[in-house]
Amino acid sequence: MPQQSLKIIENSQKKLPCNIEAEQAVIGSILVSNDIYDEVSLLLDTNKFFDPIHVKIYETIEKLISKGLLANPITLKNHFENNEGLKELGGQEYLIKITKFSTSTKQAIDYANIVQEMHIRRELIKISESVLYEASSNTEAETSGDEIIQKAEKSLFDLAERGHFNQSFMK
């Protein structure tokens, strides 16, 4: 049984849970109708996205909308002209492409929930890896089993409350 647990952790390293299409649909929907951002932002912030380019796009959308400005492929163009990651995906054409994934507000919220769910699963994997690291590297009893459990409980509680855990567990 312990070998099976280690294999699960090894496999988690290979492919973290994500849904790139859901991320594209959320961002594309906001780029078509900025009003959707008001609903989606209740569920998501930049750290919920998996794809680093989507993180940057969503971050820029947040900045523009918070200033009362329009966020669409044209207004985002200047923010990403020199971004190598976006260039690899096709540059401004990528921003236009993901608007084709745009949906209704209801569907965008459903997709935002999927993005949130994938984020929670990635965070659970991080917590599991932290517990494994703490338990296996502190064999000299620097940290007691009870302390490791308390840290894990706090991390899980933080995740349940806010959708992310305090990275200090890993320190």
Named regions from a protein language model:
Residues 51-52, 81, 92-165:
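Extended, charged alpha-helical coiled-coil/arm scaffolds that mediate oligomerization and mechanical coupling
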Residues 1-120:
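Noncatalytic partner-interaction/assembly domains of nucleic-acid and motor enzyme complexes
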Residues 65-69, 162-167:
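Active-site phosphate-binding and catalytic loops of NTP-dependent enzymes
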